[in-house]
């Protein structure tokens, strides 16, 4: 393959040769003498000129090809540099954005953390340090300021705003949400009972009765502790003697002073069984109650002695000694226990002031069914020399009075209310188990 420069050079040479041949033929026709001059002078000039022209054209082609290659190389290098620069700019942009984002995130976290600490400090200072304390009331002029204060003028330890704020924090479950404001009080209690039964997996209609063996053990330990304290410190005897001394002014004139001669608090324990949970009657399924069968076979005895005074025709004319011992040997009943509020019942006594002071909070309500069984053993001894022992009429009279007292207080439809203490943990109720080191330190202190 010939290059384009070589091809043009060959064509040009052929054209010159043809021209030269034509001129030679023309000149040879004109004159034969000028041929030598042409060969010696004119032909070298023509060849030199032809060589120079071909050399210039070849150099020009070489320069053009070199310039084209240089331009292409420059173009390729510029494109490559542009692409590399674009990649570098993109990488640098992404890195700068990442660094800016990380710095901004750190700044946000720092600012939010500082603000949260400031808010907590403001809350603590406002609601716990600068809250309204109890207002000290001054007594009248000239009078002594006693330790007693009128509770009506003492503000609560927490301010009203604090109490509202704390009450807004304590929330109940989802069932006590916005719908509770629309429901009535009856529907609310009914839904609460159903929620408790559902979440404790207890079906009132199908659940089988329980034996309460574990509860019998706890009750036995409690009663045993009570008996030990009574035997060691004579608490029951002192309490009864103090009660009799306070009531001595109310005794009839024909009775002398009463003295306690016997006190037996038993040695057995009650057995509770057949516990079942059911809806309270006449409550429209708004309150639950527990029915428990109780059985006690023991001897609970109280013995007293006194004198029957004969004040006619003059005071203390004669005195008839009387000794009585009343024992409960058997008690069977169905115990009803439930938790309720004081608003659901009314007091039976006329003194409603004490009831109003205790109104509020939750109460443990218990009562016994009318089909109870209470067996007594009454022993009586009347007289000094000729004594009458175990008179049936006296036994039946005492038994009827005790049952009457029991029915008026503890048998349905009457109930006994016991106010439950607050179950919230308090520091004054906190205790820990005593160790050997504590015993040694206490003994050394006593010595």
From Swiss-Prot:
Gene Ontology CC, one term: ERMES complex
Which cysteine residues pair off into disulfide bonds? none
Query: Residue ranges, Cytoplasmic compartment?
Result: 131-447
Would I find Membrane among this entry's keywords? yes
UniProt cross-references to CDD domains, sorted A to Z? SMP_Mmm1
Q: Where in the cell is it found?
A: Endoplasmic reticulum membrane
Q: Which GO terms describe its molecular function?
A: lipid binding
Q: Where, by residue number, does the polypeptide cross the bilayer?
A: 110-130
Q: Which UniProt keywords apply?
A: Endoplasmic reticulum, Lipid transport, Lipid-binding, Membrane, Transmembrane, Transmembrane helix, Transport
One Pfam family linked to the record: MMM1
Record keyword DNA-binding present: no
Looking at the record, the residues that make up the SMP-LTD domain are 208-421
One of the GO biological process terms:
protein insertion into mitochondrial outer membrane
Record topology, Lumenal segments: 1-109
Topology versus the membrane, per the UniProt entry? Single-pass type I membrane protein
Q: Which HAMAP family does this one have?
A: Mmm1
Could you say which protein family the record assigns here?
Belongs to the MMM1 family.
Quote the function comment for this protein.
Component of the ERMES/MDM complex, which serves as a molecular tether to connect the endoplasmic reticulum (ER) and mitochondria. Components of this complex are involved in the control of mitochondrial shape and protein biogenesis, and function in nonvesicular lipid trafficking between the ER and mitochondria. The MDM12-MMM1 subcomplex functions in the major beta-barrel assembly pathway that is responsible for biogenesis of all outer membrane beta-barrel proteins, and acts in a late step after the SAM complex.
The record's note on quaternary structure and interaction partners says: Homodimer. Component of the ER-mitochondria encounter structure (ERMES) or MDM complex, composed of MMM1, MDM10, MDM12 and MDM34. A MMM1 homodimer associates with one molecule of MDM12 on each side in a pairwise head-to-tail manner, and the SMP-LTD domains of MMM1 and MDM12 generate a continuous hydrophobic tunnel for phospholipid trafficking.
Q: What is known of its domains?
A: The SMP-LTD domain is a barrel-like domain that can bind various types of glycerophospholipids in its interior and mediate their transfer between two adjacent bilayers.
Report what the protein is called. Answer: Maintenance of mitochondrial morphology protein 1
Q: Write the gene name.
A: MMM1
């Amino acid at each position: 393959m010939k290059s384009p420069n070589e091809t043009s050079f060959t064509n040009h040479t052929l054209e010159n040769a043809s021209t030269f041949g034509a001129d030679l033929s023309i000149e040879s026709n004109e004159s034969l003498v000028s041929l030598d001059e042409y060969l010696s002078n004119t032909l070298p000039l023509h060849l030199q000129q032809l060589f120079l022209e071909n050399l210039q054209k070849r150099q020009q082609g070489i320069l053009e090809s070199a310039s084209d290659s240089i331009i292409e190389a420059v173009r390729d290098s510029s494109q490559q540099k542009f692409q590399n620069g674009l990649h570098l700019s993109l990488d640098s942009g992404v890195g700068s954005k990442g660094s800016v984002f990380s710095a901004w995130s750190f700044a946000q976290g720092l600012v939010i953390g500082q603000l949260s600490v400031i808010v907590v400090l403001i809350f603590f200072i406002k609601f716990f340090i600068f809250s309204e304390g109890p207002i000290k009331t001054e007594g009248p002029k000239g009078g002594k300021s006693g330790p007693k204060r009128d509770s009506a003028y003492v503000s609560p330890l927490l301010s009203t705003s604090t109490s509202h704020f704390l009450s807004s924090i304590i929330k109940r479950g989802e069932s006590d949400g916005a719908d509770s404001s629309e429901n009535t009080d009856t529907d609310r209690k009914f839904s609460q009972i159903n929620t408790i039964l559902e979440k404790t997996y207890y079906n009132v209609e199908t659940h089988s009765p329980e034996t309460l063996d574990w509860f019998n053990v706890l009750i036995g330990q409690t009663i045993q502790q009570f008996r030990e304290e009574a035997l060691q410190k004579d608490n029951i005897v002192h309490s009864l003697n103090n009660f009799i001394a306070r009531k001595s002014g109310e005794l009839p004139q024909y009775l002398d002073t009463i003295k306690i001669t016997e006190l037996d608090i038993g040695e057995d324990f009650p057995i509770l069984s057949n516990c079942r949970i059911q809806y309270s009657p006449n409550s429209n399924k708004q309150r639950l109650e527990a029915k428990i069968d109780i059985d006690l076979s023991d001897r609970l005895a109280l013995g007293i002695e006194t004198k029957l005074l004969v004040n006619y025709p003059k005071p203390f004319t004669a005195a008839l000694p009387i000794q009585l011992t009343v024992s409960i040997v058997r008690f069977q009943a169905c115990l009803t226990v439930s938790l309720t509020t004081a608003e659901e019942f009314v007091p039976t006594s006329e003194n409603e002031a004490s009831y109003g002071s205790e109104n509020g909070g939750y109460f443990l309500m218990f009562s016994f069914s009318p089909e109870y069984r209470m067996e007594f053993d009454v022993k009586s001894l009347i007289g000094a020399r000729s004594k009458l022992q175990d008179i049936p009429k006296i036994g039946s009279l005492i038994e009827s009075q005790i049952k009457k007292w029991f029915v008026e207080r503890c048998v349905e439809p009457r109930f006994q209310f016991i106010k439950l203490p607050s179950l919230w943990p308090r520091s004054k109720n906190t205790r820990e188990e005593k160790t050997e080191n504590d015993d040694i330190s206490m003994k050394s202190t006593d010595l």
